[in-house]
Amino acid sequence: MEKDYFSQKPNSTVVIPELFIAISLLAAILATIFWFAPRPRLNSDAPKSQVPANFSLESLPEWLHEHEQSHGSVIEGAEATIDWATKPEVTELCVLYVHGFSATRQEIAPIPEKVAAHFGANVVHTRLAGHGLSENPMAATAEDWLQSMVDAWEIASRIGKKVVIIAVSTGAPLSIWLNEQVIEKDRVHSFIFLSPNFRIRNPFGFLLTWPWAESWVPLVIGREHSWEPENEMAARYWTNRYETQAVIEMQKVVDWASKLKPDAEQAPMATLYMEDDPTINHTAAVAFHRRWPAGDKQLHRVTLDAQNPQHVFAGDITAPHRTDWCVDVCTRFIEGIR
């Protein structure tokens, strides 16, 4: 008699559970490997300041100049600087400006300078490590950027009784790190963020810090990233070609900030953003602002020329037509706190 292989299922009750167990075990092993595998993560420990503790106010600009010169290839106009309101003395407010990824202090100039002048405040312009270099640009790590932040804060806190931090794009999460890890909270007057990067626009940005990303991401998207600057000044003061590793370093900072859940009362914050920002996810920027636990907060959607969204939406280089509006928003916000 011929066997009926369709009706005869002698091992079906055994094979199916065994297959399910095997698949489940494999999934568990892969999940464990994925969870514990090495991945790019920010070492958020605060480095020690490199600024000499015993230097007078008059000596700080000279130290900063020599420190910048030690890097050898800093583009003129991109270097970190101290701008005194009048003379070397402590002012009621100091403006600390933190530029964004691949940019320099010229990014939104002259907005920080005009805001500072309005209040008779000193200004510290940060230059994040690896930025603004003519040779080997953007080769620094995110942890090197933290060192730049610590040094900039050390100077700003010495030359101002309170500090207004103005930051653009990735400068915003770096400023939040500074607030959490380094500074005395009562020394921060306020935060003013322009296009803050708490998530990049590309929905696959999270892959930049997946396990072994430093090995496989450059193979997928290329070892270099480049873009076409919109004018000669943008070409000078932004790095428009850099290794993909630099983008991974940026994502490390964003990841750290996205996990932060501040619960204590914080310094006032103003956030300025454009809908449909081509670089960052503006919804994430708004969400971070709304969960920031501060009594004084202002959220400003840029409506001037809103049909032409820009990431760097103000400043002489990229959008001079919005500069005065931005200065007015910033000064009114600060005045409302004082």
Q: What is the predicted role of each segment?
A:
Residues 73-131:
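Short, surface-exposed "cap/lid" segments of acyl-processing enzymes
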Residues 166-175:
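Gly/Ala-rich beta-loop-alpha elbow adjacent to hydrolase catalytic centers
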Residues 192-203:
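Active-site nucleophile loop of the alpha/beta-hydrolase fold
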Residues 110-111, 267, 280-291:
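Short alpha-helix in the alpha/beta-hydrolase fold that links the catalytic acid
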Residues 133-159:
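Catalytic nucleophile-loop/oxyanion-hole region of alpha/beta-hydrolase
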Residues 292-313:
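Catalytic histidine neighborhood in serine/cysteine hydrolases
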